[in-house]
Amino acid sequence: MAHPHLLAERISRLSSSLEKGLYERSHAIRLCLLAALSGESVFLLGPPGIAKSLIARRLKFAFQNARAFEYLMTRFSTPEEVFGPLSIQALKDEGRYERLTSGYLPEAEIVFLDEIWKAGPAILNTLLTAINERQFRNGALVEKIPMRLLVAASNELPEADSSLEALYDRMLIRLWLDKVQDKANFRSMLTSQQDENDNPVPASLQITDEEYERWQKEIGEITLPDHVFELIFMLRQQLDKLPDAPYVSDRRWKKAIRLLQASAFFSGRSAVAPVDLILLKDCLWYDAQSLNLIQQQIDVLMTGHAWQQQGMLTRLGAIVQRHLQLQQQQSDKTALTVIRLGGIFSRRQQYQLPVNVTASTLTLLLQKPLKLHDMEVVHISFERSALEQWLSKGGEIRGKLNGIGFAQKLNLEVDSAQHLVVRDVSLQGSTLALPGSLAEGLPGEIKQQLEELESDWRKQHALFSEQQKCLFIPGDWLGRIEASLQDVGAQIRQAQQC
């Protein structure tokens, strides 16, 4: 792949030119461009009058000398209107069944078919062959067709269990469009004087036939790394477990992988990256319900697994647990001993905290974990003022279990050694101890493990920062991934400060 970053820059500039004058259609243009560059088909779902046909018309200008064909289907449409009329002369003089295809679908690089589901069986069957094999049977001859992009559109989905499902399955990219939402964009659209049918693309950016053919071969050379395949397989397994998940054919998975390869290729990379998998959200859904489900599952994959976020959090949890164990091993030395007040004949014994315990919030470790309020508890956080009042006056005492959530009611007492003991429902007790002094710092074992974890986090964040330069991925998805990584980083740094 020659000068990959220059190619990525060129495709970005080409897309920007195609997007001019089209408001809130950047994502649709970019994915249609990606489909055209990889020879795939697109289905646009949405109400009339939202620029579906204009999107397809624009894509013609991405290529030098590209021919376009567009047609509005009705129940009465005939194959002649789509694939060309029969040659009366050939039929009369030579008895040959031959269509005159000039100006029709078989000789167009960019094809737009509106209200696609109204097409009859004769059109659908020929269209399936054209999409699958890029061939058209014209009489006795089988002709290769130059179609690079088929954009089909409708304001409805095909009926389930209908003859249309085979064609719908060939539409790899599926986009749900709506009218312009933003107020400023709506105003700009109303007042724009730009001729929507003018060519907005400079000749220097247009793609030649030679470039297109060469790129098709080079797209196939983009590798699929093992860790990316594992993410894809994880998504597939998760979808198989969900009762409401759409059926995704092996053919659709295979075609989707080529789309991911194209995304990597035109982003200047030699291998598919986890960020490319976000494109699957526009490939795997079938209807409105499955659209939301697919997006949710891919969101979980991207924010939890694609850059090892969940794995790093699991490692962090184990390190924190080990740190607490080490602290508990030292807890006998730091068991909290309260000070007894008053005489031995007082009606109720009163206590106070040692003078060296001054923090407004006290985190006390359990010498052995207890199950309190259905939670395995290793430490409890108390408000100093609440604990002092309980030591002085008795009554109810509450603390945050493991330092999280709301403060819970506790069974707390002072034993004969003047240590605080917390008990569970079976009255098993655990002595509360102060954590090691801050001056001691983190144990060497814990410090090293946290440093290694932080190093791994930096590597994953650097990988994401490098891979996120992808024209075809919406910015809001990238923002959520960045937030998930930053959250992991913040938790690691917090643990290092303990």
Curated annotation (Swiss-Prot):
Physiological role: Component of the RavA-ViaA chaperone complex, which may act on the membrane to optimize the function of some of the respiratory chains. RavA functions as an ATPase.
GO molecular function, one term: ATP hydrolysis activity
Keyword terms, alphabetized: ATP-binding, Chaperone, Cytoplasm, Hydrolase, Nucleotide-binding
Family of this protein: Belongs to the RavA family.
Residue sites binding ADP per the record: Y23, G49, I50, A51, K52, S53, L54, E196
Classification via Pfam families: AAA_lid_8, ATPase_RavA_C, bpMoxR, LARA_dom
Catalytic activity, reaction form: ATP + H2O = ADP + phosphate + H(+)
E.C. number(s) listed in UniProt: 3.6.1.-
UniProt cross-references to CDD domains, sorted A to Z: AAA
Enzyme class: hydrolase
Highest taxon in the source lineage: Bacteria
Organism expressing this protein natively: Escherichia coli O6:H1 (strain CFT073 / ATCC 700928 / UPEC)
InterPro entries according to UniProt: AAA+_ATPase (IPR003593), ATPase_RavA (IPR023671), ATPase_RavA_C (IPR022547), MoxR (IPR045427), P-loop_NTPase (IPR027417), RavA-like_AAA_lid (IPR041538), RavA_ATPases (IPR050513), RavA_LARA_dom (IPR046898)
Subunit structure: Homohexamer. Interacts with ViaA.
Subcellular location per the Swiss-Prot or TrEMBL entry: Cytoplasm
GO terms under cellular component: cytoplasm
Protein name per the record: Regulatory ATPase RavA
NCBIfam families tied to this protein: PRK13531.1
Matches recorded under PANTHER family: ATPASE RAVA (PTHR32204:SF0)
UniProt activity-regulation remark: ATPase activity is stimulated by ViaA.
